[in-house]
Amino acid sequence: MTLIKSISGIRGTIGGPAGDTLNPLDIVKFTSAYATFIRRSGASESNTIVVGRDARISGEMVKNVVCGTLMGMGYDVLNIGLATTPTTELAVTMSGAAGGIIITASHNPRQWNALKLLNEKGEFLTAANGNEVLGIAEKEDFDYADVDHLGKYTEDNTFNKRHIDSVLALKLVDVEAIKNAHFKVCVDSINSVGGVILPELLDALGVAYTFLNGEPTGDFAHNPEPLEKNLGGIMDELKKGGYDMGIVVDPDVDRLAFICEDGKMFGEEYTLVSVADYVLSKTPGNTVSNLSSTRALRDVTEKHGGKYTAAAVGEVNVTTKMKDVHAVIGGEGNGGVIYPEGHYGRDALVGIALFLSSLAHKGCKVSELRASFPNYFIAKNRIDLTPSTDVDAILVKVKEMYGKEKDVTVTDIDGVKLDFPDKWVHLRKSNTEPIIRVYSEASTMEQADELGKKLMQVVYDMQ
């Protein structure tokens, strides 16, 4: 079965039996449930819901079903067309809408699509809100509008420009310094909306560029997750010379990775680290990332006199913690930069503009900038379990076992994370598969993998 229902929305592959995949019936059900939740929450007096989508092949079909359903629920639809996730988030607040639906499966392959649900602040629903939507959908507890109260449909394609204008207006985005640096970059926008909005951003910043996979066809030229194993094309292009750096985004442009001028990966974990270092040098303060992100952010934060706090995995958890500790910047180690001066959402446009500002100020090569940060390596493993395994009980045992050791700090807000003086390991159960994900970090990849495998054996011995 490839239909996954979660607190953040619904996702699945297109085509196949009803109930097993993302099909029009389920799209109607969950869109109706979301509209019912928004109406009952009473958080906004607006009767408008924003809809934006990435360039996936199925996007037009899904968008039509979503928009028709919202109108059937009595909501006016503001369709902003092909738009990034952060653009859609901003459109909610800029238009004063009651909420928004983003049609994107993020980094998943071309056959996938999804509905991501926003509140009136343009932020993802909390776990409690998401569960409420799931409950409404399960009961099919919704009423449609009568013929005199159907919603209206409007299109507005100005939000890309408004998004870019908001980025250029940020105090720490030094447009003049970037223009004077005369950067030339190569961009892989993986045949989606990055190919629509990033040329406009780079033009505004005076950056020369070459695009790979720039046509927003939705027919992805390679696996769309911005990991080194998928980026051979742009890495080879950088190795030819003539570029200052490479820029890679995922299909909905909330994840961002850089490539050094020599064709080597900057490291997706270091996207946030590098941007945070620049922001903290100008506006000292606190930072937040999730438990599975690199320790380098903590090091950089403490260097600037701030305090680092870890949050549970998931954007809504990170933004909630950022508000709690008044963080000046935060995000996730997968290349997600959250800068509250812009908005509380991962935004690759903000990340690009801040990174280029930093590079222009420092006057160094991207590889030299990368070498200035603490060097850590993250290993990723998984423990396959039987469906009958009590994962929670195993994690409790791990917590109790290592909680007795004085040189280990145990965190259990999201699985179990064990922080050692010079390394860490994080065990998280999957919500969709009988597995435990094991993330570990150390000063070498060998040490990181060794630590991860050690904890894997501990878990196997407990079964």
Which residues does each PLM region occupy?
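Short glycine-centered, acidic/aromatic-flanked micro-motifs in structured strand/loop junctions
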Residues: 52-53, 187-189, 260, 341, ...
